[in-house]
Amino acid sequence: MISNFDCTDNQASSKVLRPPGGGSSDIFGSEMPQTPRNVKNRMASNIFAAEKDNGVKNNGDAPRRGQKTVDSHSRLFGEPTRPITPGKNHMKSSIPFGQNTEAVAAQKLLTTNGHYNGKSGSVSSASSSVSSSTENLKMNSGSRSVFRNMSKPARAETPIPPADDALSIDNSCRDSEVGDVPADNRTVTKSDQVNEGCQTRRDSGNNPEQPYSLNKMAGVSNVKEPLGLCPNEIKEERQACAKLDSRNPITGLGLNGDGVGGLKPKKLRIREGNPVTGEGYKANDFTQRQESSNGGTPVINKNRIPPGGFSSGLW
């Protein structure tokens, strides 16, 4: 026997869907999470060492899991606590005076490992300062002596007499002073100066009998060139065709009424008056009637102004 029982299920049905965006969505008034999101800071630089802060995660500064910590600063720029190199003594001269050059260079390479900055220690720095001061005194005294020698006036060198077999070009040059010019020798003539009036030339190499000077030149020769062209180069002038000049193939003017070779001549119509209003025309142009018999029935032809006048494009 079948009986119906009313059963109420207080449990939530599994068919209830979650709201869009999840249960923590802001549309349903839920509380915002208090923990910050884990967002990777991609703009952070990982060149320098990362700060050891457990509260900051995924910022790109800490190395990944399973990797060794790499100090990028020491790899790129060296150790931050490296020893400071002392400054180089620029006043110390590197030119040895009174010492064996090879021995000094070998000793310097052995003591400084190939590098020398002028200061190797307290004792060496004191000795180097003393040696540099003595070397500077030597250099200064030498430079002063050179300057004194240069400032002294140069002595006139006595010319060495040339050998007998020496050429004139090999002899040393000697400046000779020229004294005052005497009063009777004021007018100086050039050695190459000649009188232009005495210069002569010939017309041709075959005629030595006709020399002439620049002051007395021969007249212009009477030989004249022909003004026109030679007869063999004269071209006959072409006679223009009379038909081409006496007609116009477009308007028909000048065809003498034959109409050959072009359009027929167009008769010019001369009208004196207004074609629209009819003023200026003769009276018989509008009232002229031509009676013609067409089967016994008279036909009246009237010369009237067309619609729009004679200036219309239809006529």
Swiss-Prot record:
<feature type="compositionally biased region" description="Basic and acidic residues">
    <location>
        <begin position="62"/>
        <end position="76"/>
    </location>
</feature>
<protein>
    <recommendedName>
        <fullName>Microtubule-associated protein Jupiter</fullName>
    </recommendedName>
</protein>
<feature type="compositionally biased region" description="Polar residues">
    <location>
        <begin position="1"/>
        <end position="14"/>
    </location>
</feature>
<feature type="compositionally biased region" description="Polar residues">
    <location>
        <begin position="285"/>
        <end position="296"/>
    </location>
</feature>
<dbReference type="GO" id="GO:0005874">
    <property type="term" value="C:microtubule"/>
</dbReference>
<feature type="modified residue" description="Phosphothreonine">
    <location>
        <position position="81"/>
    </location>
</feature>
<feature type="compositionally biased region" description="Polar residues">
    <location>
        <begin position="134"/>
        <end position="148"/>
    </location>
</feature>
<dbReference type="GO" id="GO:0005819">
    <property type="term" value="C:spindle"/>
</dbReference>
<feature type="modified residue" description="Phosphoserine">
    <location>
        <position position="133"/>
    </location>
</feature>
<dbReference type="InterPro" id="IPR033335">
    <property type="entry name" value="JUPITER"/>
</dbReference>
<dbReference type="GO" id="GO:0005875">
    <property type="term" value="C:microtubule associated complex"/>
</dbReference>
<dbReference type="Pfam" id="PF17054">
    <property type="entry name" value="JUPITER"/>
</dbReference>
<feature type="modified residue" description="Phosphothreonine">
    <location>
        <position position="85"/>
    </location>
</feature>
<feature type="modified residue" description="Phosphoserine">
    <location>
        <position position="122"/>
    </location>
</feature>
<keyword id="KW-0597">Phosphoprotein</keyword>
<feature type="region of interest" description="Disordered">
    <location>
        <begin position="1"/>
        <end position="37"/>
    </location>
</feature>
<comment type="similarity">
    <text>Belongs to the MAP Jupiter family.</text>
</comment>
<keyword id="KW-0963">Cytoplasm</keyword>
<feature type="region of interest" description="Disordered">
    <location>
        <begin position="272"/>
        <end position="315"/>
    </location>
</feature>
<dbReference type="GO" id="GO:0008017">
    <property type="term" value="F:microtubule binding"/>
</dbReference>
<keyword id="KW-0206">Cytoskeleton</keyword>
<keyword id="KW-0539">Nucleus</keyword>
<dbReference type="GO" id="GO:0031116">
    <property type="term" value="P:positive regulation of microtubule polymerization"/>
</dbReference>
<dbReference type="GO" id="GO:0005634">
    <property type="term" value="C:nucleus"/>
</dbReference>
<feature type="modified residue" description="Phosphoserine">
    <location>
        <position position="24"/>
    </location>
</feature>
<dbReference type="GO" id="GO:0005829">
    <property type="term" value="C:cytosol"/>
</dbReference>
<feature type="region of interest" description="Disordered">
    <location>
        <begin position="116"/>
        <end position="166"/>
    </location>
</feature>
<feature type="region of interest" description="Disordered">
    <location>
        <begin position="51"/>
        <end position="89"/>
    </location>
</feature>
<keyword id="KW-0493">Microtubule</keyword>
<feature type="compositionally biased region" description="Low complexity">
    <location>
        <begin position="120"/>
        <end position="133"/>
    </location>
</feature>
<feature type="modified residue" description="Phosphothreonine">
    <location>
        <position position="35"/>
    </location>
</feature>
<dbReference type="GO" id="GO:0005200">
    <property type="term" value="F:structural constituent of cytoskeleton"/>
</dbReference>
<feature type="modified residue" description="Phosphoserine">
    <location>
        <position position="94"/>
    </location>
</feature>
<comment type="function">
    <text>Binds to all microtubule populations.</text>
</comment>
